[in-house]
Amino acid sequence: MSTPENMAWPAPAKLNLFLHVNGRRSDGYHELQTLFIFLDHCDWLRFHINNSDLVDIKPALADVPPEQNLIYRAAMLLKQYSTQPLGVMVELDKRLPMGGGIGGGSSDAATTLVALNYLWKINLPVDELAELGRQLGADVPVFVRGHAAFAEGVGEKLLPVEVTQKWYLVLVPECHVSTAEIFRHKDLKRDTPKQNWRELQQGNWHNDCEPLVKKNYPEVEKALRWLIEYAPSRMTGTGACVFAEFKHEHEAREVLALIPTWLRGFVARGENLSPLHVVLQQVYA
């Protein structure tokens, strides 16, 4: 294994196996219930530590100014915990789509927090690191904590859970869905009754954002219509990605082989423990 100073750190994708919207609070945020799992399909980040006091990212993401880049913002948040001139050049191998509902930006931010917490020797406990992550986005803490979780509230209440391991075919429609736009929309269904985790384990899962996204983004509706011919399918998060689950890898790959030219997709295994935390356990071993 590479030494921590030159190794690649994974930033895994996530799926929301369901997303139930229970209501909207007076502050505008939504009460949700959702189930997060990780996939073994990842962005990869290398962190080249220096004492320049600068945070540099290569290649720069097109159309994303540095101060809006979650990797940059995560590193700058962490720098506040040291008086040393900490610097880093982050090398990003971007494989997860942006605006896809599989957590690409949030996962990159979490991996930056976790890796630099170690490499910069800041050594914040995981609770503090997750709280920093929450400042960057509602999904960042689950990536920081690194275990499949049932989430409630505005996503801040996380119950670690074990989910039966399956294989997933994820399709990536050629569109970018704005999470903020979907949650602002007057037609979003916001009245799914809350259930406890024991009740939810019985199934009847759905995604309350899916009907609205299908209506406003024909590419998502078209992808779901194609995929549902082969297996029960749903959208993850606020989209645009959609997924179907399979018991065996070969079943998922057989459907992937049939994918039409207007679609992209990948097959990945569902994980209860984040690939990031598998690496972290090796680093601290």
Swiss-Prot record:
GO terms for molecular function: 4-(cytidine 5'-diphospho)-2-C-methyl-D-erythritol kinase activity; ATP binding. Pathway: Isoprenoid biosynthesis; isopentenyl diphosphate biosynthesis via DXP pathway; isopentenyl diphosphate from 1-deoxy-D-xylulose 5-phosphate: step 3/6. It catalyses: 4-CDP-2-C-methyl-D-erythritol + ATP = 4-CDP-2-C-methyl-D-erythritol 2-phosphate + ADP + H(+). It comes from Tolumonas auensis (strain DSM 9187 / NBRC 110442 / TA 4). Keywords: ATP-binding, Isoprene biosynthesis, Kinase, Nucleotide-binding, Transferase. Its EC number is 2.7.1.148. ATP binds at P97, M98, G99, G100, G101, I102, G103, G104, G105, S106, S107. This is 4-diphosphocytidyl-2-C-methyl-D-erythritol kinase. GO terms for biological process: isopentenyl diphosphate biosynthetic process, methylerythritol 4-phosphate pathway; terpenoid biosynthetic process. InterPro entries: GHMP_kinase_C_dom, GHMP_kinase_C_sf, GHMP_kinase_N_dom, IspE, Ribosomal_Su5_D2-typ_SF, Ribsml_uS5_D2-typ_fold_subgr. Catalyzes the phosphorylation of the position 2 hydroxy group of 4-diphosphocytidyl-2C-methyl-D-erythritol. The gene is ispE. Belongs to the GHMP kinase family. IspE subfamily. The active site is at K14, D139. It comes from the Bacteria. It is an enzyme of class 2 (transferase).
